[in-house]
Amino acid sequence: MAAQGEPQVQFKLVLVGDGGTGKTTFVKRHLTGEFEKKYVATLGVEVHPLVFHTNRGPIKFNVWDTAGQEKFGGLRDGYYIQAQCAIIMFDVTSRVTYKNVPNWHRDLVRVCENIPIVLCGNKVDIKDRKVKAKSIVFHRKKNLQYYDISAKSNYNFEKPFLWLARKLIGDPNLEFVAMPALAPPEVVMDPALAAQYEHDLEVAQTTALPDEDDDL
């Protein structure tokens, strides 16, 4: 039996992407998850239990964060095994981190077939954006969901989790009924910039995909 108030619905979520893209910053925004995280020494991983309250009851994502070991090459299969969903993160101010997204996707689906995956472009609060909406096409080719996010400003923090929860529960009408306590914003996302980026993404969605054979 789950303890009183303990979510019975939980999912293993793996968070992958190049080092320095903001994965740890992102997961640490959720304050109770940061407070209750556990370190798995055998895999060199921190597991953050992120609880979200929905109209279908509480849902917990046990978010596996690599603690930086991706800087030394790929991750071991033990990190991916039994993952039920994933977030792949890149940094919109660094083109190389987007170029590496197909490698992360390949490693992930080699171990975890057919799990829901969200692609997130982080650091959209920074004015010097290099990876624009029109060049982010990988998710369309692989049937992933995409969101612009800004971990430091909390912009769109909940979006990847809501999309994954709807997929995993099988209810497109699932909603979060309360937002989790998040760390105060370290930067402010310019509302005009956010509106522009949302418009750019809508336009990009309706643009034909390029014909080239490579993965990006």
From Swiss-Prot:
Modifications made to the protein after synthesis: Acetylation by KAT5 at Lys-134 is increased during mitosis, impairs RANGRF binding and enhances RCC1 binding. Acetylation at Lys-37 enhances the association with nuclear export components. Deacetylation of Lys-37 by SIRT7 regulates the nuclear export of NF-kappa-B subunit RELA/p65.
One GO term (biological process): ribosomal subunit export from nucleus
Interaction with RANBP1, as annotated region: 211-216
Effect of residue 76 to E: Probable loss of interaction with NUTF2. Loss of transport to the nucleus
Enzyme class: hydrolase
Site residues by UniProt (Essential for GTP hydrolysis): 69
Gene Ontology MF terms in the entry: cadherin binding; chromatin binding; dynein intermediate chain binding; G protein activity; GDP binding; GTP binding; GTPase activity; importin-alpha family protein binding
Residues in cross-link Glycyl lysine isopeptide (Lys-Gly) (interchain with G-Cter in ubiquitin): 71
Crosslink position(s): Glycyl lysine isopeptide (Lys-Gly) (interchain with G-Cter in SUMO2): 71, 152
Location of the protein in the cell: Nucleus; Nucleus envelope; Cytoplasm, Cytosol; Cytoplasm
Cofactor: binding comment: Mg(2+) interacts primarily with the phosphate groups of the bound guanine nucleotide.
Family the UniProt entry places it in: Belongs to the small GTPase superfamily. Ran family.
Record's subunit section: Monomer. Interacts with RANGAP1, which promotes RAN-mediated GTP hydrolysis. Interacts with KPNB1. Interaction with KPNB1 inhibits RANGAP1-mediated stimulation of GTPase activity. Interacts with RCC1 which promotes the exchange of RAN-bound GDP by GTP. Interaction with KPNB1 inhibits RCC1-mediated exchange of RAN-bound GDP by GTP. Interacts (GTP-bound form) with TNPO1; the interaction is direct. Interacts (GTP-bound form) with TNPO3; the interaction is direct. Interacts with KPNB1 and with TNPO1; both inhibit RAN GTPase activity.
Primary role: GTPase involved in nucleocytoplasmic transport, participating both to the import and the export from the nucleus of proteins and RNAs. Switches between a cytoplasmic GDP- and a nuclear GTP-bound state by nucleotide exchange and GTP hydrolysis. Nuclear import receptors such as importin beta bind their substrates only in the absence of GTP-bound RAN and release them upon direct interaction with GTP-bound RAN, while export receptors behave in the opposite way.
Protein name: GTP-binding nuclear protein Ran
Organism listed in the record: Homo sapiens (Human)
